[in-house]
Amino acid sequence: MGHCYSRNISAVEDDEIPTGNGEVSNQPSQNHRHASIPQSPVASGTPEVNSYNISPFQSPLPAGVAPSPARTPGRKFKWPFPPPSPAKPIMAALRRRRGAPPQPRDEPIPEDSEDVVDHGGDSGGGERLDKNFGFGKNFEGKYELGKEVGRGHFGHTCWAKAKKGKMKNQTVAVKIISKAKMTSTLSIEDVRREVKLLKALSGHRHMVKFYDVYEDADNVFVVMELCEGGELLDRILARGGRYPEVDAKRILVQILSATAFFHLQGVVHRDLKPENFLFTSRNEDAILKVIDFGLSDFIRYDQRLNDVVGSAYYVAPEVLHRSYSTEADMWSIGVISYILLCGSRPFYGRTESAIFRCVLRANPNFEDMPWPSISPTAKDFVKRLLNKDHRKRMTAAQALAHPWLRDENPGLLLDFSVYKLVKSYIRASPFRRSALKALSKAIPDEELVFLKAQFMLLDPKDGGLSLNCFTMALTRYATDAMMESRLPDILNTMQPLAQKKLDFEEFCAAAVSVYQLEALEEWEQIATSAFEHFEHEGNRIISVQELAGEMSVGPSAYPLLKDWIRSSDGKLSFLGYAKFLHGVTVRSSSSRPR
């Protein structure tokens, strides 16, 4: 499989341009980030990475310098056969979200000009849309609007100043969302959800502050913190397209800190990209803040989302497969990390379909310059975020504990994935718990740093963790968003901990992820060492029927499972132990080489 190489991220005029939501438009761009810069022949036909909120600040680049972090020459990437394009259903989904009109039907046009509910293509009439949100009504009396500083599909953002109250004379940013564009119940619900998210998440150091929300007959006004330092993308361009490692680490710690926070609240952003991070000021050490939760959503601990949203260059493979969770945000951060360190996009295509094929099939290039000069730990960090298997991808909390970022002394947050792993462990069979205990004794010291931090964040009592420890830890971090996503419901499935405690050794067995360990280069040594422990402490005679029950498979799997049991003593072989740890299905097992 070859590599996809990046291209210019500059504005282009006469080609397909994906919007901030990943949609391709054939119309010329109306907002050029650097209109004075001539179009390069190399950049012709390159989709623009378009911002939802266009930066109001002038580029620091001199005229004639290509405004792009993409320095790698473009190369054509040919496939042996054209795969089905995922672009069409994505475009359709985005059109529905924005309330675009459906395909024409042989029906009379309603004479009434009032908005009606879009029934998604069903024939017949509809109900009038209720666009009354119940927000405050006196925006004009409290704020004086200034110039426009950004514009997107769903609205525009203006500078404003408070006229009265505690915030008198304070400058703010006001996102103005036109009610005329709310042409479906989905688009109305998107606005309600965005406001609810901003309210719940405001207050974290790296989240844009939410102040208030108002409405009138025509618009919704969301009053937020004004970040005057411009976009992260502009800073990347100002530095010639890439960041030195030491500076990239400082940026990524801030991005991961915010992401770990809203993931713990049960929120998935779904559109993380350099344009959606703003600096509070022009200072080099300015604080970075995440913005634009217009595509974000609440997600339950046992839920997978299936609607395809986001920006093409940053979309995760599982999003294209329509089954994803918070891991999709981590892929986007992996793309941002790649750009920060080398100045190129890891996946490129002339069209959205080509970009998506590249995301699904190609591997990022870590061979060309400047990668040979970048530290091995930095490359490992990026690779573990750009793993196409979402189960092997680091969480935000795990990424903060990665050796590459450890010198930055990032404050670690509780990782909700620990709750899901512990829940599975305490509900597992004794045989599986023995296998995981053996694996925990082979965990590398570098990985133990994360587990030790999580153990202490759960505030153990008398050296152990009870159900109350898990409950109180969630309570300490809870916001209204966590209640909306119903994450505390997982505590109802952890009742066995009401009668016992987990010491640190057993916590490691419960909270270790087999897939995370498999992503490490030393996985073979880890598995071998773990099997040696299992041979001494947990391996026993097991029948094919019992093993099938442990794996939750039927009699059709017996021939396969028989190969996992040693004929000499009836115990699990090394192959059987590794497969048993995975809990893989028969289909996935038989498709892998032995």
Curated annotation (Swiss-Prot):
Task: Extract the ranges annotated as region (Calmodulin binding (CaMBD)).
Answer: 428-448
What activates or inhibits this protein? Activated by calcium and calmodulin. Autophosphorylation may play an important role in the regulation of the kinase activity.
Q: Which GO biological process categories is it annotated with?
A: protein autophosphorylation
Matching entries from SMART domains are given as: S_TKc
Binding locations of ATP:
V149, G150, R151, G152, H153, F154, G155, H156, T157, K175
Which GO terms fall under molecular function for this chain's record? ATP binding; metal ion binding; protein serine kinase activity; protein serine/threonine kinase activity
Can you name a GO cellular component term? plasmodesma
Domain EF-hand: start-end pairs:
446-481, 482-517, 518-557, 558-587
Q: Establish whether keyword tRNA-binding is in the entry.
A: no
- Which EC number(s) does UniProt give? 2.7.11.1
What does the entry report about post-translational modification of this chain? Autophosphorylated.
Where along the chain is composition biased (Basic and acidic residues)? 116-131
Reactions this protein catalyses: L-seryl-[protein] + ATP = O-phospho-L-seryl-[protein] + ADP + H(+); L-threonyl-[protein] + ATP = O-phospho-L-threonyl-[protein] + ADP + H(+)
- An example of a Pfam family matching this protein is Pkinase
The entry's free-text remark on domains says:
There are 3 contiguous domains conserved in the CDPK subfamily: a kinase domain, an autoinhibitory (junction) domain and a calmodulin-like domain. The autoinhibitory domain (409-439) inactivates kinase activity under calcium-free conditions.
- Indicate what this protein is called per its UniProt record: CDPK-related kinase 4
Q: Which organism is it from?
A: Arabidopsis thaliana
